[in-house]
Amino acid sequence: DEKRLSRLIANLDILTGVPANILDVTGRDIRLFSGHPPFCRAVNACPEGHQRCVACDAWKVGSYRGDGGFQYYRCHLGICEALMPLYSKDQPLAWLVFGCYLDESPLEEQWARTRTRLDWWPGDVEELHRAFLQFRQYTGEELRAYAETLESLAAYIRLEGMIQSAEQSDLQRLERYLDQHYMEKLSLAPLSRQLH
């Protein structure tokens, strides 16, 4: 239910100021959130920057090694982000991400790390530096509290069935068949053909 998901993501940003988003199973942004910080908007406005961000999203999904909770990392430019799968049974259907923040280490150190990764940037690095300084910094305690809140939200998303697999289970196919044929005389042969 894209509309409800979009509203939840927007509400999180309003309440916390921390951008959250949903990526599809391959790590592609499904465009539920458009309020990225100025630094990220500037990088994404550059074709090479956008390509690097897309590749980074795919990388973080492919390298997830968590236990179902959030895995924290720094993106290709050193900005802090976190990722967790939204499961159906044992398979991720989508990914819940939050990020575009800085940790509590000194800003100068974080900028120095980012600056070393900008040799490809075609524009004025000082403009990016000014945008970088607009990132909010969060303590570990704040991030844990936010992650716990998002984990509860992830459980709600699963419970409400807001994200569905395109592939239907046997039970879902059976329910659909019964819904469509409830007025007919049922027998096992046609039912079995429909399920397999």
Explain the meaning of each model-derived region:
Residues 29, 89-93, 186, 195-196:
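Solvent-exposed, well-ordered amphipathic alpha-helical segments
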Residues 164-186, 190-196:
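A short, Lys/Arg-enriched amphipathic alpha-helix from helix-turn-helix/homeodomain DNA-binding modules
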